[in-house]
């Protein structure tokens, strides 16, 4: 049996250009070549994939602070005279003790993303179940002071939060002050609550003068502390530091002491050691999850027990155990003040390859903290914000230890299952096998704002915001992009592949409930490998069979494996994905397919994403009957390649070898295509439409002219426009036009005639004409001031040219001979 400890997790130097930009404080924006692009027509995917980087307040600098954040959790760096530590998000669960019976963190709702620590926050809403969640800690020497800055994920009640920084070494561990309940080596302790700061001697407890000062930046959720050199001067020495965050009890003047059950003022889930801290800094060696290895699990119940035992899903396994022991000595950093003095840049403490957790700033911000009352699974609302409501969101990566390919790494978007989190695949062979294939691909897993978002609304938007963030920090080849997911993530794979089909080369849903039969037709140009279990207790054989029937009805390429026997957890726990890596291979996205089928379902569109009204070289898809789905099927004859025949179902069987379960038998049914036949090349489009009133075809990408022959079959009125062509030329608008009479010629494509024209002025139709060959249009009685002219000219062949321009009306004087004398000859 393989163990994850046997895997190499090499750390390479970060790309020089990215490091240089980071230390200079320049925002690292996505290389345009790292995101999908087309020469004309609609961009693939939703608009949020291409949105600019968000400037979140928590990531901003003010005052003496200038270095950009690391945004790699568990990383340490020296940047431009500052030392930075980046913590993990939502890891503030404290010591591992006895579970609080009223803990709002439900072990059922988060069965596959359990926490290891047991501390619970006081029930006061001001603490938002997240008040002591450390985001970042910084240190910077100033002229006469040493500055520290702590950034928190939530800061609604500054007077209820405290942190302590242990400074210096000692031969024996010292008790942290103010009831923190832990010990570590230290010479001094700096404790801050609200805007009160105290520097104390670790041996005597005496307060040192002059006093440290603390300032609060509520908007950025940052607390800055300055210690005068007269009280403590590190000079150019190397100083040992440790730090922890907890809840402050103002009435008692100390850290709030955990009891068995949380009250409005006291935490619950306490431990016998009395550790009162929720979150420790400098945890650079938190273990990654083991995907249940070496335990064996087939059912959900068996898998849930193993993930609970593992306890690494929020990257706080060591934190929980160490806090429970009361001795936090292992969580420390050696801060070199000589490096800080010479403003050295050193990112060697930041993971570059292997299994990594990152942080990005979302466009969406629904408040602070964690709202456990939000349950997307059972919500009837179309928009669900998820329980992790803040602007900062985490995601997981596997970055292969390979040379960067000339065009960049591929990308595999991997979505977690119901009740799991973004770290579900961290540390897995799946991540490594899919990532290490070929020239290398980065595997990225979103949190999607909670355990049950179903990759709809804001959970779906989180996927694309994550993708955009990956593209900001790594060079990607967007032609090598695949999508996969487990259980709910498998359903999300079907969902995202069918909604945004021109983003993906291949799709790999694992035990995923299928989406609608109609949606499978949108997968025409995406080969799919699907794995299911014969004895799956959640996604049973009937769902597996429905997925296969959907694929067969749609006539797509679909490789359907059913492991026998296998429960809902077997494939993940077995953790062997060699055949999937082979299937994904080096396949590239086909963005300009000759045959496009797409379902337009506005009921799936949400405020979080742009409408799914475009795919491949089709855009402007508008449903005729609002609220009902529409479908379009378009074949371009320009390539001279016809539809390949759908081959008969191929049956086979085998065993999957190499995983933790040993040989796992499977039955396989494969739907594939034969060789594509040659057809006569023609400037022709065959368009079949249901419940769509309009569509725009991008001519260059479809391979046709601006005046192709269009064979249209529709169940109602449908306008087919041809885009990607020169717009209908209109007269210049540099000068005003005569409002009494404005005439312009109708230019059109070569060998075409304008057979119908509609002209709108400020949205009102002024002209509607039909004819054999319309050459010009005249407008009269135009507005005196600015007005907008829109012309829709239909050419022979059915394509439409549309142009819009704004003009300014005026009354021009006409030549006159009145008052002049003429000499006759």
Name every feature range the model reports, one short phrase each:
Residues 389-392, 401-411:
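Proline/glycine-enriched tight loop/beta-turn segments at coil->beta junctions
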Residues 35-198, 248-255:
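Surface-exposed, glycine/proline- and aromatic-rich loop segments on solvent-exposed faces
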Residues 408-473:
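Active-site machinery of serine-nucleophile hydrolases
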Residues 34-77, 169-188, 232-323:
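Acidic/polar low-complexity flexible segments
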Residues 25-34, 143, 207, 339, ...:
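Polybasic, low-complexity, intrinsically disordered segments
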Residues 529-532, 536:
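Short beta-strand/loop motif that positions the catalytic acidic residue
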Residues 282-399, 553-557, 564-729:
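Alpha/beta-hydrolase-fold serine-hydrolase catalytic core, especially in secreted/extracellular enzymes
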Residues 401-407, 454-488, 498-504:
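Gly/Ser-rich "nucleophile elbow"/oxyanion-hole loop immediately N-terminal to the catalytic nucleophile
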């Amino acid at each position: 049996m393989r163990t994850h400890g046997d895997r190499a997790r090499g750390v390479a130097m970060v790309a020089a250009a990215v490091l240089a930009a980071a230390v200079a404080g320049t925002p690292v924006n996505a290389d345009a070549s790292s995101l999908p692009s087309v020469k004309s027509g609609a961009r693939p995917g939703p608009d949020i994939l291409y949105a600019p980087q968000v400037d979140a307040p928590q990531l901003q600098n003010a005052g003496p602070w200038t270095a950009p954040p690391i945004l790699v959790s568990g990383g340490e760096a020296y940047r431009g005279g500052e030392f930075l530590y980046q913590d993990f998000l939502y890891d503030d669960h404290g010591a591992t003790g006895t579970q609080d019976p009223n803990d709002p963190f439900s072990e059922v709702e988060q069965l596959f993303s359990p926490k290891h620590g047991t501390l619970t926050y006081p029930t006061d809403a001001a603490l938002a179940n997240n008040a002591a969640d450390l985001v970042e800690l910084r240190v910077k020497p100033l002229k006469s002071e040493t500055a520290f800055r702590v950034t928190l994920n939530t800061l609604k009640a500054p007077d209820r939060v405290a942190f302590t920084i242990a400074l210096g070494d000692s031969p024996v561990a010292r008790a942290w002050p103010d009831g923190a309940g832990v010990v570590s080596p230290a010479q001094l302790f700096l404790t801050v609550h609200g805007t009160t700061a105290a520097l104390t001697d670790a041996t005597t407890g005496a307060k040192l003068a002059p006093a440290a000062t603390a300032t609060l930046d509520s908007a950025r959720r940052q607390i800055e502390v300055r210690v005068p050199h007269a009280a403590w001067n590190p000079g150019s020495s190397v100083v040992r530091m440790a730090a922890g965050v907890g809840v402050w009890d103002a009435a008692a003047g100390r850290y709030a002491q955990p009891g068995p059950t949380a009250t409005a003022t006291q935490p619950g889930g306490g431990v016998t050691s009395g550790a009162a801290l929720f979150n420790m800094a400098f945890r650079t060696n938190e273990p990654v999850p083991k995907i249940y290895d070496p335990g064996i699990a087939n059912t959900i119940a068996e898998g849930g027990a193993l993930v609970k035992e593992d306890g690494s899903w929020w990257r706080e396994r060591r934190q929980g155990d160490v806090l429970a022991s009361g001795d936090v000595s292992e969580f420390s950093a050696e801060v070199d003040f000589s490096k800080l003095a010479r403003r050295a840049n050193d990112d060697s403490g930041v993971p570059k390859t292997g299994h990594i957790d990152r942080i990005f700033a979302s466009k969406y911000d629904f408040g602070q903290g964690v709202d456990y009352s939000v349950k997307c699974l059972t919500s009837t609302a179309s928009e669900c914000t998820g329980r992790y409501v803040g602007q900062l969101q985490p995601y997981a990566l596997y970055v292969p230890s390979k040379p960067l390919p000339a065009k960049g790494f591929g990308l595999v978007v991997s979505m977690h299952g119901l009740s799991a989190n973004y770290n579900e695949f961290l540390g897995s062979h799946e991540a490594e096998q899919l990532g290490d294939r070929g020239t290398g691909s980065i595997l990225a897993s979103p949190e999607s704002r909670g355990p049950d978002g179903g990759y709809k609304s804001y959970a779906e938007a989180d996927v694309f915001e994550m993708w955009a963030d990956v593209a900001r920090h790594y060079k990607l080849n967007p032609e090598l992009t695949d999508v996969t997911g487990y259980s709910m993530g498998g359903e999300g794979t079907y969902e995202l592949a069918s909604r945004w089909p021109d983003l993906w080369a291949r799709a790999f849903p694992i035990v995923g409930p299928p989406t609608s039969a109609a949606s499978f037709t949108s997968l025409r140009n995406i080969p799919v490998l699907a794995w299911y279990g014969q004895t799956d207790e959640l996604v049973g054989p009937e769902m597996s069979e429905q997925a296969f029937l959907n694929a067969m009805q749609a006539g797509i390429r679909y490789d359907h494996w059913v492991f026998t026997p296998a429960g809902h957890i077997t494939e993940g726990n077995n953790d062997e994905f060699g055949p999937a890596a082979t299937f994904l291979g080096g396949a590239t996205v086909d963005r300009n397919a000759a045959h496009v089928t797409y379902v337009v379902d506005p009921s799936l569109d949400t405020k979080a994403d742009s409408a799914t009204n475009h795919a491949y070289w089709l855009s402007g898809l508008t449903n005729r009957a609002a609220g009902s789905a529409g479908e379009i099927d378009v074949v371009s004859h320009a390539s001279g390649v016809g539809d390949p025949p759908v081959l008969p179902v191929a049956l086979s069987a085998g065993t999957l070898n190499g995983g933790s379960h040993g040989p796992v038998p499977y039955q396989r049914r494969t739907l594939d295509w034969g060789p594509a036949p040659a057809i006569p090349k023609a400037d022709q489009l065959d368009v079949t439409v249901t419940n769509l009133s309009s569509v725009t075809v991008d001519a260059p990408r479809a391979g046709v002219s601006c005046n192709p022959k269009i064979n249209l079959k529709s169940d109602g009125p449908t306008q087919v426009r041809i885009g990607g062509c020169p717009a209908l030329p209109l007269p210049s608008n540099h000068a005003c036009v005569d409002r009494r009479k404005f005439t312009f010629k109708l230019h059109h494509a070569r060998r075409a005639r304008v057979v119908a024209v509609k002209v709108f002025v400020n949205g009102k139709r002024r002209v509607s004409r039909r004819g054999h060959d319309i050459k010009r249009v005249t407008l009269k009685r135009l507005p005196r001031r600015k007005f907008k002219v829109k012309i829709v000219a239909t050419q022979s062949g059915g394509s439409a040219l549309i142009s819009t321009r704004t003009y300014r009306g005026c009354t021009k004087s006409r030549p006159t001979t009145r008052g002049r004398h003429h000499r006759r000859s």
